[in-house]
Regions:
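Short helix-boundary/capping micro-motifs
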Residues: 11-29
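Beta-alpha-beta core module
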Residues: 149-155, 160, 218-268
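Flexible hinge/capping segments at coil-to-helix
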Residues: 154-162, 166-188
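A short LG(V/I)-centered, amphipathic sequence patch enriched
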Residues: 41-60, 77
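Central regulatory/effector-binding core of bacterial HTH transcription factors
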Residues: 89-148
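Alpha-helical linker/hinge and terminal dimerization helices associated
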Residues: 7, 43-44, 65-94
């Protein structure tokens, strides 16, 4: 059987065109690479190389062999990746969260339901979550849209709306509701990791200056000791967890209210059924 490394050498030589450059990339000597190419030629039993003084080239068959080698190496890499992903899935559940509130609510639940498993989570925009479920980067995801493809199994798990938290002296504090355009141009406190909300803020309030904070404690301290507006979530407001001395005004744009969905591959819905049974459309409220 042909050594995979010899196929890598053939592919690299075909890409480089010279022994010296290929040897440098492969971190080997030219004589060693020449011997290896000769062994490969002997293995397949056909002439792959043209030889002249101080030059080694590829025959048409050699060029075709190099193309096949590249394909085989790609398949080998895919094989290794899939095996590693599968092995990791036996011990680790990777989940993508599209916003902070679902992560806060579901993480303790997931740890309870899948006790003994390692939980690995990301919190970012969900525009590629379905792709990451397909390629098994994630086993679970929480999105702010419901997938329509039968490839995915999903369930609504709640709702969140955004408010703007203002000091009593802010002119907007006298309004029963506001729109994003009312906030455009203001200086606003904002957490750094807020998933898909981040893109929405940038697009809908392009003239606002955001004072980005890494930690919730920093937001709380600044909200307590400054007059900067700060976004608040209906989830925390409904639980009485508000910024002291501030008035929470609802932001009524459609973009500021969303439903959340727990998603997995349909082929794995039985595996994650215990979690899906634990959640409902009021889990996040």
């Amino acid at each position: 059987m042909i050594d995979i490394y010899m196929l890598q050498q053939l592919k690299t030589f075909a890409e480089c065109g010279t022994l010296s450059e290929a040897a440098e990339i492969l971190n080997t000597s030219q004589p060693s690479l020449t011997r290896s190419m000769k062994r490969l030629e002997n293995e397949v039993g056909v002439t792959l190389f043209t030889r002249s003084k101080n030059h080694l080239g590829l025959t048409p068959t050699g060029k075709m062999a190099a193309e096949y080698a590249a394909q085989l190496l790609s398949v080998t890499q895919d094989f290794e990746s899939r095996v590693r992903v599968y092995d990791r899935s036996l011990h680790t559940i990777s989940i993508g969260f599209c916003a902070p509130v679902p992560q806060t609510v579901l993480t303790p639940m997931i740890n309870t339901v899948f006790e003994g498993m390692t939980i690995s989570s990301d919190m970012t925009d969900d525009n590629d979550f379905l792709l990451k479920l397909r390629n098994h980067t994630y086993q679970l995801a929480v999105t702010h849209f419901q997938p329509e493809e039968p490839t995915f199994h999903s369930k609504k798990i709640g709702h969140e709306s955004l408010f703007i938290s203002l000091t009593p002296g802010n002119p907007l504090a006298f309004y029963p509701e506001v729109h994003l355009q009312d906030l455009d141009g203001l200086t606003i406190l904002l957490l750094s990791r807020i998933g898909f909300w981040s893109k929405m803020h940038r697009e809908k309030t392009p003239n606002s200056k955001y004072l980005i904070q890494l930690e919730t404690d920093s937001i709380l301290e600044l909200a307590t000791n400054s007059e900067y507006p700060v976004f608040s979530s209906s989830y925390y407001i409904d639980r009485g967890e508000t910024f002291p001395g501030r008035i929470n005004i609802p932001i009524v744009d459609d973009e500021c209210s969303t439903d959340f969905y727990l998603v997995c591959l349909s082929s794995e819905k039985e595996k994650y059924a215990p979690l899906f049974r634990r959640v409902n459309e009021n889990t996040i409220r």
